[in-house]
């Protein structure tokens, strides 16, 4: 993806993040599926990525029975869909994996005629996705968000001996001066080379999406220097650990970190979580619904995709999972506490310093995974 496209896309998203509806009808007439299939829909999705009430309402409205399984990393999803015969009708990969999976023949094209609410999708997201899905033929944006970090404010203050955070808040998880102190209360990294290495590259001032082997090695070596201070590697478990006070700093998905914050508040356990948005920038991504090549309930998958693009449904899902929905009209229906939160809807200043987590070549991805596995093993 060209840097000029990246800059234009993320800035445009920031400028329209809290904008009004799309230029198409928010509630077009429903489309009839081309062919009746079974009354089932098998979904493979990220954990904590939908309001259960919207799923129940979909089942009641359509008579379609859904079954959902969950993954916590793009690597896990990719391994499943590339082997074929996954047994799923719908998945939600991230932008960094979409292009490679399309080229591998893992998905079938969508039929936009069966998605009347397609026009509600933020056009800037569609432009961003065209870099990996030319013509937007396979992927339908669902949510977009950021990779950032959160802290347990009381534990961090105690460990640092001050309530003042470093000017570059990424120092908390990458700089030995700070990680050595936070080791006592627990630091968590992503359990994903695809997500973690770009953040380390960005911290070093290098191209976050660099495929230069020396850059990738430099990023991993930097993390090796603090490996002994990292308590765990997790792409979803950090939610409950942060909420319970078992970690004091975690790198994660913005929405998941906000879920941890909400769970701690609901538990009234004295844990105070703050989701940070470092002014030096964060990673930006888009997750899209896609239909596997061997899906058995294709019409039902289209019906569900269309359902999630309804403004009221997208707003309800977005508020529940604390991520920005792809449906622009939905944003007008969300409470200001969500739309004004930079960890959910990043502002212009943050987006100007941020980067899109872009696809990697097979060779670069292989190197990243190899070095990442060595890092986790302490080698």
Regions found by a protein language model. Give the residues of each.
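Early extracytoplasmic/lumenal segment of secretory-pathway proteins
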Residues: 27-101
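C-terminal motif of bacterial Sec signal peptides marking the signal peptidase cleavage site
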Residues: 14-17
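Hinge/lid segment of periplasmic solute-binding proteins
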Residues: 27-35, 99-144, 166, 171-174
């Amino acid at each position: 993806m060209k840097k000029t496209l990246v800059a234009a896309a993320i800035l445009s998203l920031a400028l329209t993040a809290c904008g009004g509806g799309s230029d198409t009808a928010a509630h077009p007439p429903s489309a009839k599926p081309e062919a009746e299939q079974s009354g089932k829909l098998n979904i493979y999705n990220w954990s904590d990525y939908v309001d259960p009430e919207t799923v129940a309402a979909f089942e009641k409205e359509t008579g379609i029975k859904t079954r959902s399984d969950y993954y916590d990393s793009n690597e896990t999803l990719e391994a499943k869909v590339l082997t074929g015969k996954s047994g799923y009708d719908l998945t939600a990969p991230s932008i960094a994996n979409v292009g490679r999976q399309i080229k591998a023949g893992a998905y079938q094209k969508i039929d936009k005629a069966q998605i009347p609410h397609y026009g509600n999708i933020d056009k800037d997201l569609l432009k961003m996705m065209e870099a990996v899905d030319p013509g937007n033929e396979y992927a339908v944006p669902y949510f977009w968000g950021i990779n950032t970090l959160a802290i347990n404010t009381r534990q961090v203050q105690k460990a640092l001996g001050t309530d003042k955070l470093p000017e570059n808040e990424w120092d908390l998880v990458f700089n030995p001066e700070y990680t050595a102190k936070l080791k006592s209360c627990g630091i968590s990294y992503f359990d994903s080379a695809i997500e973690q290495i770009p953040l380390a590259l960005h911290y070093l001032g290098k191209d976050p999406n660099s495929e230069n082997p020396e850059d990738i090695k430099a990023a991993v070596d930097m993390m090796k220097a603090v490996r002994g201070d990292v308590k765990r590697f997790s792409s979803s478990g950090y939610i409950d650990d942060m909420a319970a006070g078992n970690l004091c700093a975690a790198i994660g998905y913005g929405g998941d970190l906000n879920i941890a914050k909400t769970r701690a508040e609901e538990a009234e356990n004295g844990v105070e979580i703050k989701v940070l948005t470092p002014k030096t920038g964060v990673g930006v991504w888009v997750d899209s619904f896609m239909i596997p090549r061997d899906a058995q309930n294709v019409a039902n998958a289209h019906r569900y995709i269309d359902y999630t693009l309804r403004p009221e449904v997208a707003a309800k899902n977005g508020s529940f999972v604390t991520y920005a929905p792809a449906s622009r009209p939905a944003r007008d229906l969300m409470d200001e506490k969500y739309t004004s939160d930079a960890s959910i809807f990043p502002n212009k200043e943050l987006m100007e310093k941020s980067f899109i987590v872009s696809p990697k070549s097979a060779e670069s991805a292989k190197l990243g995974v190899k070095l990442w596995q060595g890092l986790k093993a302490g080698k």
